[in-house]
Amino acid sequence: MNTSPDYAQPGPNQFHHGAPSIYSSSSSNGVGGEVPITAQLLRGPPPPPPPPPTATATAATAAATTTTAAPSATGEPKQSGPTVPAACLACRSKHLKCDGGNPCARCQASESICQYVASRRGYKGPRRNGTQNPNKRHAAASDDGSPNSNGSNESCPMLLGAGVATPAAPSLSAFNPGLGIPETPMSTIGATPSYSGLQIYRQPYLDANGALVDINPRKAPQTIAERCIDSFYFHFFPGHPSVLPKDYLLRIAEQRNIEHLLAAMRWAGSLYFEVGPTRATFFEEAMRLMYAKDVPKDGFLVQAMLIVLVGLDGSCQQERARDILSDAERIAIEIGLFQRSFAAIHGQGIPVIEESWRRTWWDLFVVDGMVAGVHRQTNFLLFDIVADAGLPCEEHQYLAGTIPRPLYLDDFDNDIFSGEEYEFSSFAYRVASIRNLGRMMRLPESVFPGDNNVDRVENFLSNWRMHLPASKRDCLNKDMKLDEMMFQAWMINHACSIMLHQPLSQLDSSPARDVTSCAPYQMVRSGDTFNTHTRHIVTAAAEISKMVTYAVPITCHTHFFTCVLTLSSIVHLSKWALWFVQNDDDLRQQIRLNIGALNKLSTVWSAASRASGQVKGVAQEIFRSKKAAQQNNASFWVGFTQEEIISSMAADETIMSEINTMLEPVTTSG
């Protein structure tokens, strides 16, 4: 049998768009058989036996036969054969007589498909008054001899499928171009004026094998595991998009065992909604499968470890996350995931899989840099690996499976000088941003104002910002939706600017010394004036706070945004602790933005809950000390009227009340 698609005929799925098509085959296997249910309904009960023929009747019959055989010369209507209750669609479309057979003689001779549909002639619709008249006769007995007690219009023989067996399911063979049907989309056939009022099929109907099939089956409710996979793709995947898109991944899962990856995805997805003790079960299963003796060391294992370590890091299990990160790095280097040839060798000739391997390496690269940068406990091991894996493409291309030819780091670094006009993806700019963080982490520990090494790294940061194309200068894509890869790229750039310049700034960090949820406290001595390094960190901290204002669910960002917000808050708090601060209200609003974002993130990540508590506590302490100093200093109130003093104190009380409200415990989902 030729299995290639015939684009001249509609596919089987088209017959199930909306109401099923009225054009169904008289027999699902193409051979004449059981009378269609439409013909059964239209024929009704068998007629009574005719009376014995008389001479008059015999003569009339002979005359009718003669009249039928010879054309009428007067143009009067010709006498036809016995009246039949319906004509098939083929005869109707050609305006020919039909003998009502199944199949009828014409269709049998032309080898056409003989189909019937109920006529609405004589049908006056349902009664307006639902009360039955007891003096009227009820419906005739059903075919099996039992009376029909259903008085509703569902029992009306004008509606197909009422109280009788239903026809076979529509199939591709049921479509007959010879029926003269206009070339309209199949989805509109059921809505044509001639048949729009008919109940064509009742559910369930019979399939080709005679089995009952529900044409509108109710979708079974999702299991917790399935909901967790969907949650993973909605919340976690946009921030770390290395695994295959869902449809591709499920196909791979049918071909080989990737249960360890699915287990890791289920656990990560369970972090975003309440699943009870199932979450711990998912985690134990993921750990057991990842470290099973027979698990293959391949890219799928690296992906599973990457997901788990990110989840653990956001759940305040940083040491355990670092252990898994070390294992993932070792396996990635052993299998050559960083090499250009890896994607081609292990991609099975499928561009989406090849792209997934490239993304796996670079996402591991970014995560390694973020862990090293925000926690300052590791040294960004993968930064020293000479990698030539292709750079990832845009997110919409990856999800659609339209993978372009990959570009490489050499193309990115030499873009301006080569004369080539390349368009790099947001993921590529994210990689470039984390490389600048790696350069900063390779600086000597002791730096001093005017150090050329600091200036060199700042040149990288500034060049990254200045040479962004117009479409990448904010975190929105061309559809005005959040571009999470550019969001992270900007986030890393601002965080790197703070980490680079804070040791040389003149902003005393001691007021925020208790904010240690992400990294240990680093003392910065204050100075008499704000130097250029202080300006860098104040600007970067304000830009990070501005990133909170994007109208997207903040829990869809990577959890590393928690530590970047904390870094920004330390700068804000250090500046707010000064005696006189310009734009004091703007600064307080930025602190409130950061605390609000940390509160939202804490519903998923316990690390955010810890950071939020520390930032709130420091903000409360600074506010109290500033308030006490102001009230105890009599000269402070010189020039204020009594009304202004009372108004100022009332405003302070309002701020204090807001901070206390923020200090209320946040219930986390884990």
Curated annotation (Swiss-Prot):
Keywords: DNA-binding, Metal-binding, Nucleus, Transcription, Transcription regulation, Zinc
Compositional bias segments (type: Low complexity): 55-74, 142-155
InterPro entries for this protein: Transcription_factor_dom_fun, Zn2-C6_fun-type_DNA-bd_sf, Zn2Cys6_DnaBD
Known uses: Iso-A82775C is a precursor for the biosynthesis of the anticancer natural products chloropestolides A to E via a Diesls-Alder reaction with maldoxin. In the absence of the prenyltransferase iacE, siccayne accumulates instead of iso-A82775C and can also be condensed with maldoxin to produce chloropestolides H to K, which show also antibacterial and anticancer properties.
Signal peptide: none
One Pfam family in the UniProt entry: Fungal_trans
DNA-binding region: 88-114
Entry's localization field: Nucleus
Top-level taxon of the source organism: Eukaryota
Regions of compositional bias (Pro residues) in chain numbering: 44-54
A biological process from GO: DNA-templated transcription
Coiled-coil boundaries: none
Region entry Disordered, spans: 1-84, 122-157
GO molecular function, one term: DNA-binding transcription factor activity, RNA polymerase II-specific
GO cellular component: nucleus
Annotated PANTHER family: ZN(II)2CYS6 TRANSCRIPTION FACTOR (EUROFUNG), ZN(II)2CYS6 TRANSCRIPTION FACTOR (EUROFUNG)-RELATED
Purpose: Transcription factor; part of the gene cluster that mediates the biosynthesis of iso-A82775C, a enylepoxycyclohexane and biosynthetic precursor of the chloropestolide anticancer natural products.
Annotated protein name in UniProt: C6 finger domain transcription factor iacK
Organism: Pestalotiopsis fici (strain W106-1 / CGMCC3.15140)
